[in-house]
Regions:
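Short, charged/polar N-terminal "headpieces" of proteins
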Residues: 1-47, 134-151
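Sparse, context-dependent recognition of short Cys/His-centered cofactor- or disulfide-binding micro-motifs
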Residues: 7, 56, 60, 91, ...
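Acidic-enriched, low-complexity/disordered segments with a strong bias for Aspartate over Glutamate
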Residues: 12-18, 33, 38, 52-57, ...
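Structured domain cores in non-transmembrane regions
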Residues: 28-73
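C-terminal charged interaction modules
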Residues: 79-151
Length: 151
């Protein structure tokens, strides 16, 4: 889990500081990693995008799309009993968060020149803290591909 604090002005001009919590379970990470398997997985695709954007060789659209996907998939809140939840009464918390100024500030900051250097550490903080063994992940991908006759 990673915790980010963003600051912004409220509608009445007041200063607001909001804490954002982002986390993916191993299953969520595996699902996202499979979506980017044509690029060598999520982390490899992220690194390629970062290199291309920093070198000026790429439009920002793929980076924006990836960040939106990851941030919204990982967004949730910590409960009083220490659990991390992404739904309340059947509603995804990310649905409301996506329209918030906090989300906007986080996304705009990450896409800024100084924010680009924060993207990889942010993503590495979102993935499961007990790590995802690359060999285990590859074996699971192969099992899924074999089951889907994609191997």
């Amino acid at each position: 889990m990673i915790v980010k604090t963003v600051k912004y002005k409220g509608f009445d001009g007041e200063d607001i500081e909001e804490t954002i919590r982002l986390h993916l379970t191993k299953a969520e990470f595996l699902n996202l990693d499979l979506k980017y398997s044509d690029y060598g997985g999520l982390i490899n695709y992220l690194r390629k995008l970062l290199t291309d954007v920093k070198d000026g060789d790429s439009y920002m659209r793929p980076m924006v799309t990836m960040l939106q996907t990851l941030i919204l998939a990982a967004y949730g809140k910590k409960t009083d009993d220490g659990r991390f939840v992404k739904k309340v009464n059947g509603t995804l918390l990310a649905d409301e968060f996506e329209t918030s100024e906090a989300y906007s500030q986080l996304l705009i900051h990450l896409l800024s020149e100084e924010g680009l250097d924060e993207i990889e550490p942010l993503i590495m903080g979102i993935i499961p803290s007990d790590g995802v063994d690359p060999k285990e992940l590859q074996a699971k991908k192969e099992q899924i591909n074999a089951a889907l006759n994609l191997a």
